[in-house]
Curated annotation (Swiss-Prot):
Catalyzes the sequential condensations of isopentenyl pyrophosphate (IPP) with dimethylallyl diphosphate (DMAPP) to yield geranyl diphosphate (GPP) and with GPP to yield (2E,6E)-farnesyl diphosphate (E,E-FPP). Keywords: Lipid biosynthesis, Lipid metabolism, Magnesium, Metal-binding, Transferase. Binds 2 Mg(2+) ions per subunit. Mg(2+) 1 binds at residues 84, 88. It comes from Mycobacterium tuberculosis (strain ATCC 25618 / H37Rv). A motif (DDXXD motif) lies at residues 84-88, 236-240. This is (2E,6E)-farnesyl diphosphate synthase. Pathway: Isoprenoid biosynthesis; geranyl diphosphate biosynthesis; geranyl diphosphate from dimethylallyl diphosphate and isopentenyl diphosphate: step 1/1; Isoprenoid biosynthesis; farnesyl diphosphate biosynthesis; farnesyl diphosphate from geranyl diphosphate and isopentenyl diphosphate. Isopentenyl diphosphate binds at residues 43, 46, 77, 94. The gene is idsA2. The keyword Nucleus does not apply. Its cofactor is Mg(2+).
C-alpha cells in the first residue's frame, strides 16, 4: 500500500508541475525540489494509518481518489518537516542537507545579491508552504468530487484538527525550548499535540471519516493514537540522541544541541536531580548550547547512566502495549486489527 500512496503522490505532483510550467524555470525548480523531497524518502506512516482507518469500518478498498486524500497527509508532513528543520536550524534531513542549506548554497553558487542564508530560509519557508497549500487542495478536490456531503463535513473537521494541533504543538515546542521547561508533563503534552495527533490519531480518524459515520470508532482511535503516537515520538527522542546517523539520516545529538525539551531530556534531568546533582547541573548548562562531538558523547553517557534511556524504553513498551490492548477491544474488523497491530509495532520499534 505504501507503493500505491507514492504512485498517487507522483501523479499528483507531476500534474501540478506540468500545470505550472508557464510560471518559468525557477518556480519549476521549487516544485522539483518538493517532488524530490516527498518522493525520495519517508515511511508513508500517516497515509497508511488513514488506510487502516478506512478499513476499520469498510470492507471495500478505497478508490484512487480516496487514496489521493490519504496521500495529502504526506504533503502535510513535508510542510511540517521543512519548517521544523528551519525552526531547529537542522543541518541534515534523510541524509542530505536541509532545504534552507541547499537554497543558501544555490544562492552562493549563482553569486546572487544579498544574504545566502536569508535566501535559504525564505525559499525553505515557501517550499513548506507549497506542500501545505497543495495538501489542502487535495482535500478540497477529493471532498468535492468523490465524497458525499456528510463525509465531506467529517473529513473537513478532522483535517482542520490536524492542522491546528500541528501548529499548536510546534508553538508549545518552541516555548518549551525558550523557557527551558523541565517537566515531563510539559514534554508529554508537546509530544501528544505535535506528533501523536497528526501521526496516528487524526490519520486514523480521517480514514474512518471518509468511509462512514462511526463516532464510536473515532473515539477509540483517539485513545489508541494518543498512546501509540507518544510512543512513536519517544522513539524519535531516543533516536535523536542515540541513533545511528547512517540509518536515521540526521546527526546524533541534534536534539541536545538545539535544546529540544523532549521527554527523554526531561526524564534525564528529573532522575539526575534525585541521584547525581553534578550530572543534573551538566544537563542544565549544556543542553541547547554549541556542543562539540565530545560533549554530545558525554551528555549521551550521562543520560544513559541516570537511567533516562531505560525509562524511555519502558514508557515506549508500556504505551505500545496499552495501545494494542485498546485496539484488541475495538469494534472493527479483524483485517484492520492485524494491519494496525503490525503498523504499530513498526512505528514504535523503528531504527530511523
Amino acid at each position: 500500500m505504501a507503493g500505491a500512496i507514492t504512485d498517487q503522490l507522483r501523479r499528483y505532483l507531476h500534474g501540478r508541475r506540468r500545470a505550472a510550467a508557464h510560471m518559468g524555470s525557477d518556480y519549476d525548480g521549487l516544485i522539483a525540489d518538493l517532488e524530490d523531497f516527498v518522493l525520495g524518502g519517508g515511511k508513508r506512516l500517516r497515509p497508511l494509518f488513514a488506510y487502516w482507518g478506512w478499513h476499520a469500518v469498510a470492507s471495500r478498498e478505497p478508490d484512487p481518489d480516496v487514496l489521493l486524500l490519504f496521500s495529502a497527509l504526506e504533503l502535510l508532513h513535508a510542510w511540517a518537516l521543512v519548517h521544523d528543520d528551519l525552526i531547529d536550524r537542522s543541518a541534515t534531513r534523510r541524509g542530505r542537507p536541509t532545504a534552507q542549506l541547499r537554497y543558501a548554497a544555490l544562492h552562493r553558487d549563482r553569486d546572487w545579491r544579498g544574504s545566502p542564508d536569508q535566501f535559504g530560509m525564505s525559499a525553505a519557508i515557501l517550499l513548506g508552504d507549497l506542500a501545505q497549500v497543495w495538501a489542502d487542495d487535495i482535500v478540497s478536490k477529493v471532498c468535492q468530487s468523490a465524497l458525499a456531503p456528510d463525509a465531506q463535513r467529517r473529513v473537513h473537521r478532522v483535517w482542520a484538527d490536524i492542522r491546528n494541533e500541528v501548529l499548536g504543538g510546534q508553538y508549545l515546542d518552541i516555548v518549551a525550548e525558550a523557557s527551558a521547561a523541565e517537566s515531563i508533563e510539559s514534554a508529554m503534552n508537546v509530544a501528544t499535540l505535535k506528533t501523536a495527533c497528526y501521526t496516528v490519531s487524526r490519520p486514523l480518524q480521517l480514514g474512518t471519516a471518509a468511509a462512514a459515520d462511526r463516532s464510536d470508532v473515532a473515539a477509540i482511535f483517539e485513545h489508541f493514537g494518543a498512546d501509540l503516537g507518544v510512543a512513536f515520538q519517544l522513539r524519535d527522542d531516543v533516536l535523536g540522541v542515540f541513533g545511528d546517523p547512517a540509518v536515521t539520516g540526521k546527526p546524533s545529538g541534534d536534539d541536545l544541541k538545539s535544546g529540544k525539551r523532549t521527554v527523554l531530556v526531561a526524564e534525564a534531568v528529573e532522575l539526575a536531580d534525585r541521584s547525581d546533582p553534578l550530572a543534573a547541573k551538566l544537563l542544565r548548562t549544556s543542553i541547547g548550547t554549541r556542543l562539540t562531538d565530545a560533549q554530545v558523547r558525554e551528555l549521551r553517557t550521562v543520560i544513559e547512566a541516570v537511567g533516562a534511556r531505560a525509562a524511555a524504553e519502558s514508557r515506549i513498551a508500556a504505551l505500545t502495549q496499552r495501545a494494542l490492548a485498546t485496539l484488541a477491544s475495538a469494534p472493527i474488523n479483524a483485517t484492520a486489527k492485524a494491519g494496525l497491530s503490525e503498523l504499530a509495532m513498526m512505528a514504535a520499534n523503528r531504527s530511523a
